[in-house]
Regions:
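Outer-membrane beta-barrel translocator/channel fold
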Residues: 132-137
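Membrane-embedded beta-strands that build the outer-membrane beta-barrel scaffold
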Residues: 158-160
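Short sequence motifs at beta-strands and strand-loop junctions characteristic
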Residues: 71, 150-152
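Extracellular loop and loop/strand-boundary signature of outer-membrane beta-barrel proteins
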Residues: 30-32, 143-146
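Outer-membrane beta-barrel channels and translocator barrels
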Residues: 86, 163-165
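Short, intrinsically disordered, charge-balanced linker/junction segments flanking boundaries
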Residues: 1, 165-171
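Elongated, acidic membrane-bridging lipid-handling scaffolds
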Residues: 2-103, 108-125
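Hydrophobic, lipid-facing positions within transmembrane beta-strands of outer-membrane proteins
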Residues: 77, 154-156
Length: 171
């Protein structure tokens, strides 16, 4: 029996990096963030307490910033992250984007990473939002079909669940 690889790192610091990720099996052009063709610039972050094994990675994300070619700006992301082949969980979550900010808890569930190419229908979102402000123009980066839906809302506390195509909010 082979031993699975594990890796434990104290800290990684990224400063003003560029990353291009292209899955050549998919050539469809999409508006908004295209998870099969990402181009990220101005990527900076500190990752603390990193634990990696063959099925998951855990880390404390501190001050992650980036710009994606779609125009999406992440001004700040802080969270304790746990990512594996079927879910991404962010606790103690604080996110600031182009026009929105949100926080507390976020869970993304999927059957495989390829599901992100159909983010609106295949990635299930659940979370607990506190003291959030959401501008629909930021959601549009992930759901370009919502271009004609315009709203801005302040949320003191809400539970969210569903896919972008079928989303529910409770307070």
């Amino acid at each position: 029996k082979k031993n699975a690889m594990t890796l434990n790192l104290g800290k990684l610091v990224f400063s003003n990096n560029s990353i291009d990720l292209k899955d050549h099996r998919y050539s469809a052009k999409t508006k908004g963030v295209n998870f099969a063709d990402l181009s990220i610039s101005r990527f900076s972050a500190t990752l603390d307490d990193i634990d990696y094994d063959s099925s998951s990675v855990k880390a404390h994300i501190i001050k992650l910033t980036l710009k994606e070619k779609s125009g999406l700006l992440i001004h700040n992301l802080d969270a304790h992250a746990n990512i594996n082949t079927q879910r991404m969980e962010f606790t103690d979550f604080a996110l600031k984007t182009n026009r929105s900010h949100a926080g507390d808890y976020l869970l993304l569930e999927y059957n495989k990473f390829h599901d992100f190419t159909d983010f609106n229908n295949k990635v299930r979102i659940s979370g607990d939002l506190r003291d959030a402000y959401i501008d629909s123009r930021d959601i549009e980066y992930f759901a370009p079909a919502l271009k004609s839906v315009n709203f801005k809302t302040a949320i003191s506390h809400a539970a969210v669940a569903g896919t972008v195509a079928n989303f529910k909010v409770r307070n």
